[in-house]
Each structure stands twice: as C-alpha cells, then as structure tokens.
C-alpha cells in the first residue's frame, strides 16, 4: 500500500505567512496612547525621487515661498568668483597706483580764487552777487583805461542834429583830420546852412582861437575837459587834448561867443 501524499511548500508561502513583516511588527510594537496603530511619517519635499542623501539634513518645515534655510553643504559654501586671480590682482594694483597718484597731485592744485562777499538783508541771491562782482571789475577796468590815456570813444553832438556820434580820438593824428571827419559825419546839416567857413590855413572847425572871431563863424567845435568845463578846440597840443577830452560839440558861433580858448583864459589870469 502506498504512503499518503503530503503537501510540500515549493514556493515558500508558508514561511512568508509564518514570519511577520518588519513594518507590521513596528506598527504593532508602537501603539498610540489611544491604542491605535500609527503609520510611517511622510514629508512633502520638492525634488526628484531618490535624490535624498544621508549627508543632507532633513528640515521639518512646511512648503513656503520664503528664502531657503541656510545649508552646510560644500556646494552652498562655494563662491561664484575666486578671491584672488592674476588678472584681478593686476587690476587692483593699477587702481591703487592711480589713486595714490591722484592723492599726490591733489595738494599741488591751486585753491580757487575767493569771491567777493556781499553782505545784506534780505539775503542777496547768486545772480545779484555775480552782477555786483562783474560791475565792480568793469568799473576798475574803465578807471584804469581812463587813467592811462583818456576814454576810448568820445561822444559828438551838433546843434540841430537829432542824433549823436562817437569817435575814437586815437584814430586821428591832428586837429585837421578830426575836423574833416566830423564834417563828413554831419555834412547834411552843415551844407544845408551855408556850410563852414574854410580859411586858407585849413583850420576848418578849429578856427575859433579868438573870441571876437566867433561871430563870423557859422559853427565852431568845442570840447568838455575832465573838469567839466567847455573850451574851444585847438588851444592845446594834440596829445594832451586826447587825454583830457570827454565830449565834443559842434556849436553855433553865436552860442559859443562866451566860450574862450584855454590859452586866452590862462593869459587873462596871468595878467
């Protein structure tokens, strides 16, 4: 008689059923105070699956939009640029040398000129200060030019003429040249009134050396000196006349009867 058939476990199902799994044992060995089993702890991370490494610290934090917490890995401690490189060292050395040269050249520069201080109340504005400084410098220049050789231009007026002219006495070398130039300037007024008396000695407008001859003259040339006195032209040397003359005026002979040349006045005072 053959022996009875016995079941054989060729796949190992009985052994797997007999030995409990570690997860089930851990779950059963750590019950909650309430007596319920607790599952494994799951955390939500941003990253690829399997990217977790044992060197990285696990930060128990929720998903936020703030800055990342500081890490201690080598990758985070690396710098984007090296501290020292040959090119960087050379450029820093050249910059330092240029700065040293500028520091040495700075004391050698001359300090700016001090501006004239304008004091007053209410406070004077900047454009007013500049205007006062410019006018002061201009006045000094005019005084210097007057002291050196008289004014540059002299005003010329004529009785009956509605306008004035200006002449530069330095452009003429004698009274005759000045007289001819003034005749050309006011020719329309002189020729319309019987013109000037032209003598043989070509004195033209300067023919007024004697007071009794002024009545015979249609026009005579007078000037104002630095003392604001009106005199007849032609009584002083030309060089001296150009330094003291301030204004010129072509007057009618009848109006200039009371004006005497400087030479006649000086002779009358000496008597």
Swiss-Prot record:
Residues 14-33, 40-50 have a biased composition (Low complexity). One of its GO terms (cellular component) is nucleus. Residues 151-255 form the PB1 domain. Its main location: nucleus. Coiled coil: none annotated. Keywords: Auxin signaling pathway, Nucleus, Repressor, Transcription, Transcription regulation. Gene3D superfamilies: Phosphatidylinositol 3-kinase Catalytic Subunit, Chain A, domain 1. InterPro entries: AUX/IAA_dom (IPR033389), AUX_IAA (IPR003311), PB1-like (IPR053793). Residues 1-96 are annotated as: Disordered. A motif (EAR-like (transcriptional repression)) lies at residues 44-48. One of its GO terms (biological process) is auxin-activated signaling pathway. It is found in: Nucleus. Pfam families: AUX_IAA (PF02309). Belongs to the Aux/IAA family. Homodimers and heterodimers. Aux/IAA proteins are short-lived transcriptional factors that function as repressors of early auxin response genes at low auxin concentrations. This is Auxin-responsive protein IAA5.
């Amino acid at each position: 008689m053959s022996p009875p058939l016995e079941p054989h476990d060729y796949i190992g199902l009985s052994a797997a059923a007999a030995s409990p799994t570690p997860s089930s044992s851990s779950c059963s060995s750590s019950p909650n105070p309430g007596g319920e089993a607790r599952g494994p702890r799951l955390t939500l991370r941003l990253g690829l699956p399997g990217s977790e490494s044992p060197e990285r610290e696990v930060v128990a934090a929720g998903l936020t939009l703030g800055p990342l917490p500081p890490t201690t890995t080598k990758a985070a401690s690396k710098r984007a640029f090296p501290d020292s490189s040959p090119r960087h060292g050379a450029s820093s050395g050249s910059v330092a040398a240029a700065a040293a040269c500028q520091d040495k050249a700075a004391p050698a520069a001359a300090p700016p000129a001090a501006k004239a201080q304008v004091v007053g109340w209410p406070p004077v504005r900047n454009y007013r200060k500049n205007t006062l400084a410019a006018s002061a410098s201009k006045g000094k220049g005019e005084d210097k030019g007057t002291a050196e050789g008289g004014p540059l231009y002299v005003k010329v007026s004529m009785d009956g003429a509605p306008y004035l002219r200006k002449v530069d006495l330095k452009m003429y070398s004698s009274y005759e040249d000045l007289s001819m130039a003034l005749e050309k300037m006011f020719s329309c007024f002189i020729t319309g009134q019987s013109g000037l008396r032209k003598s043989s000695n070509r004195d033209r407008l300067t023919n007024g050396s004697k007071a009794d001859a002024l009545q015979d003259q249609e026009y005579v040339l007078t000037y104002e000196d630095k003392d604001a006195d009106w005199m007849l032209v032609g009584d002083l040397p030309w060089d001296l006349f150009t330094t003291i003359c301030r204004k010129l005026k072509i007057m009618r002979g009848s109006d200039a009867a009371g004006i005497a040349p400087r030479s006649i006045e000086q002779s009358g005072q000496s008597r």
